UniProtKB/Swiss-Prot annotation:
Organism: Yersinia pestis
Disulfide bond entries: none
Protein name (database record): L-rhamnose-proton symporter
Subcellular localization, as worded in the UniProt entry: Cell inner membrane
Listed transmembrane segments: 4-24, 38-58, 68-88, 101-121, 137-157, 175-195, 207-227, 259-279, 290-310, 321-341
Length: 344
């Protein structure tokens, strides 16, 4: 395994760690509705940071985006909106299935679809099956899926041991939402593939290869922002128990800390895809679809580790933690298998 691939895997791990931790600042927000908190974090992560970073990177911000046709930008935007729908469904999936089952099904589906659909649609899947490296990377995807399933099972054991249940358990509704979440969340992977002309144009402007994907986030995350923010704003405007005015009428010190913690969560969310771009740049082009598999499997891995560090796994038996550790080791094994396959 060469140094570039190792670096790519490491950067994907860093991005996934940021994703696994981003909700922690939100837990410090007090006396605000979820919709207000999510909107403030979203404004930072989906609009302010992508636009600011791109403005600093590009020699001529408006000329860069103006150089692309609608036919190029629209799929990127729509796949971003597709991801936004998946993002909303994610929360509803947890509501009806609980964390462990919801994460296991939703992440498992988005890992498979986001990773394999691109080479299938591009007619590259037969080539992958016909090469040793391709077969090894596909084996890595399968092993990662097993790891996700094991970690999810550990979560189920933990929930049972601690007496935790889904907010409104509904298997039929939850499964439908989990499948929808898994499919739509893969939109981010499809958007990155559709944005390749934007990456190439950024590279032609002399932008470092680590940063060429970042300008495309203005369009990708713009699509996701419209879906997420519209959902929040509609709820804030129509539900009687929600009020932006009430949220912003809290004591000034609390208002400032709420804004800062929400903004920090937004920054951490953005950093997952900042480092995703770095990792993506180091992955061999013929295996670029593997970036999504690495990100999603590392997200589950880091989520488990963060849970251990925050002592969320303190329950009456040791079995859940033991199963969690096995699942994490399987995901690490999967990343190594994929890395060796890409280097073959």
């Amino acid at each position: 395994m060469n140094n570039a691939i190792i670096l790519g895997i490491i950067w994907h791990l860093v991005g996934a760690a940021s994703a696994a931790c981003f909700y922690a600042p939100f837990k410090q927000v007090k006396k605000w509705s979820w919709e207000t908190m999510w909107s403030i974090g979203g404004l930072v992560s989906w609009l302010i940071l992508p636009w600011t970073v791109s403005y600093l990177l590009l020699p001529d911000f408006w000329q860069y985006y103006g150089s692309f046709s609608i036919a190029t930008l629209l799929p990127v935007f729509l796949f971003g909106a597709m991801w936004g729908i998946g993002n909303i469904n994610y929360g509803l999936t947890m509501r009806y299935l609980g964390m462990s089952m919801g994460i296991g099904i939703a992440i498992g589906i988005t890992l498979i679809i986001g990773t394999l659909m691109t080479p299938i649609l591009q007619g590259r899947f037969d080539v992958l099956l016909g090469t040793p490296g391709g077969r090894m990377t596909l084996l890595g995807v399968f092993v990662a899926l097993i790891g996700v399933a094991i970690v999810s099972y550990a979560g189920l054991l933990k929930e049972r041991a601690m007496g935790i249940q889904a907010e409104e358990f509904n298997l039929k509704k939850g499964l439908i939402l989990a499948v929808m979440c898994g499919i739509f969340s893969a939109g981010m992977s499809f958007a990155m593939d559709a944005a390749k002309p934007m990456h190439e144009a950024a590279s032609a402007l002399g932008i470092n290869s680590l940063y060429v994907a970042l300008p495309s986030y203005v369009i990708i995350m713009g699509g996701g922002a419209i879906i997420n923010l519209s959902y929040c704003f509609i709820r804030l405007a129509t539900l009687k128990n929600l009020s932006v005015k009430a949220d912003f009428s809290v004591a000034k010190p609390l208002l400032i800390t709420n804004i800062l913690f929400s903004a920090l969560a937004g920054l951490m969310w953005y950093l997952q895809f900042f480092f995703y771009a770095w990792g993506h740049a180091k992955i061999p082009q013929q295996y670029d679809y593997m970036s999504w598999m690495l990100h999603m499997s590392f997200y589950v891995l880091c989520g488990g580790i963060v849970g251990l560090l925050l002592k969320e796994w303190k329950c009456s038996t040791k079995k859940p933690v033991a199963v969690l550790c096995i699942g994490c080791l399987v995901i690490i094994l999967a990343a190594n298998i994929v890395g060796l396959g890409m280097a073959a």
